């Protein structure tokens, strides 16, 4: 992702958290009208970010300033990246060649697609600004131009690149797996959210860069199909997002496996390895079914579909292009017998995995009991270990990312740290400890865990992990010591505000 801060880092797939497009300063003489029209439609965005601290969830991290880019689109809207305005407490917009900054506000965010829409209420801001339209995805090897405000100067800059690849990529901002375009351009912080232009139309929104390994000068952008999906989703103001049918698959490129699951010669597809309860696929698909096609797209043995003669991508894209509530036709094979079924597209749930994805613009949950800080495990917490979190975060927590949820267990609860006091003597050095049960009752999720503590009638509360190790807290002493511990550690409340709101 690319905004003007020093918070670059790498995720486990090697994608940098800063996107950087080489800036070629624009010379302000002899520009034709079309170029000038594009220039005036590219906006610099200033933000003050105040993200919560997931190590001490009652506090905010030190506020910091950052900047990114955006472009004016229809309806007095400015299109940018979600990561440019995520956790923002204050947003401003500045026009090309105009020193004035205007207060802006966020009207819609899709963290999944790393896209956001902001606007400026001052009507004078949009005067003489021509909205840019959304174009079509360029063909491979076509040249595109990227506009934005990278660091190193205050004026608008431009870079050119060649579209080299279009395929599903992990979006670094929120970890989504969506279609993305790749261009061969070096990059600099500040271009995040800037438009990728061809034929005077937006054909992408700059979002991230590849770093590490041998790949150099590679930038990624959100393609037109994803942009249109988000804009259509924003029409009613409700963020429905992208659908998830509730099953997981693996490639089926082994001839022996194809024969074992009853595929005929020439048939291809992907093997269903997991069907989640209470999902659109529940009761309709079974493990070891083979998904042959989605709508009109036949699925190859490696899990790809053919979008055009020159474009293969993951079959998930055929699902992504639907909106919530639409019907999706799925053709499948079960033990050699073929069938078709329409599944209703439902909003992706965040609890298919035991570890929820990174969340933004939210207050973290926590509960302090007996001086022990308990929190739900999510990617926000894991990433708090720094840009090298895949190596520096506790292995016991990282392993949880590979586990599916179940009706009995939908979330992981962690005893993050012990706030030392008489009530928790013997446990002062315990930290990052996964709680499996409370007084013999399995932990389902953080809300149920908190309710077990709040409603406890036993003399002692016994926390146990999967290996049988126990942490025992006397309930009366926990209640008596609560105000003292909160005062000593300057903590405003024993739990997050919304935990018991219902």
Q: Where is each model-derived feature located?
A:
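N-terminal secretory signal peptides that target proteins for export/translocation
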Residues: 1-12
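Bacterial N-terminal signal peptides
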Residues: 14-25
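A conserved glycine-rich beta-strand in the N-terminal activation segment of trypsin-fold
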Residues: 32, 52-75, 81, 100-103, ...
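Active-site region of chymotrypsin-like
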Residues: 41-47, 52-53, 59, 121-131, ...
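C-terminal recognition in membrane/secretory proteostasis and scaffolding
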Residues: 48, 59, 74, 82, ...
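Short, conserved beta-turn/loop elements at beta-strand boundaries and strand-helix junctions
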Residues: 50, 109-113, 164-172, 252-254, ...
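Short beta->alpha transition motifs characteristic of CBS
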Residues: 67, 81-86, 148, 164-165, ...
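Conserved active-site neighborhood of the chymotrypsin/trypsin-like protease fold
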Residues: 74-156, 189, 339-340
